[in-house]
């Protein structure tokens, strides 16, 4: 009986994929690579130019951006590096 209960618990965890998170890069511009675990199902990379040169922002999700900002969204671990 205990074996059956344990089997059901394991099957439930595997089937529900509890706790899955996507790992996205979150370093800014040319900073050393850093990552964060995200509950969102996508990562983003925003690129734009200003008086300091080309700027890059990375993070979780897929935000809306203003005109003139290049946005790349993706759905695999560290895909926004």
Curated annotation (Swiss-Prot):
Residues 1-21 form the signal peptide. Keywords: Acetylcholine receptor inhibiting toxin, Disulfide bond, Ion channel impairing toxin, Neurotoxin, Postsynaptic neurotoxin, Secreted, Signal, Toxin. PROSITE patterns: SNAKE_TOXIN (PS00272). InterPro entries: Snake_3FTx (IPR003571), Snake_toxin-like_sf (IPR045860), Snake_toxin_con_site (IPR018354), Toxin_cobra-type (IPR054131). It comes from the Eukaryota. Expressed by the venom gland. It is found in: Secreted. GO terms for cellular component: extracellular region. Pfam families: Toxin_cobra-type (PF21947). Disulfide bonds join 24-43, 38-60, 62-73, 74-79. GO terms for molecular function: acetylcholine receptor inhibitor activity; ion channel regulator activity; toxin activity. Its main location: secreted. Binds to muscle nicotinic acetylcholine receptor (nAChR) and inhibit acetylcholine from binding to the receptor, thereby impairing neuromuscular transmission. Belongs to the three-finger toxin family. Short-chain subfamily. Type I alpha-neurotoxin sub-subfamily. This is Short neurotoxin D. It comes from Aipysurus laevis (Olive sea snake).
């Amino acid at each position: 009986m205990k074996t059956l209960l344990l089997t059901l618990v394991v099957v439930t965890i595997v089937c529900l994929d509890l706790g899955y998170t996507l790992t996205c890069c979150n370093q800014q511009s040319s900073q050393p690579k850093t990552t964060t675990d995200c509950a969102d199902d996508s990562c983003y990379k925003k690129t734009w130019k200003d008086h300091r040169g080309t700027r890059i922002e990375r993070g979780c999700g897929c935000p809306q951006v203003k005109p003139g900002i290049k946005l790349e969204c993706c759905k695999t671990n560290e895909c926004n590096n």
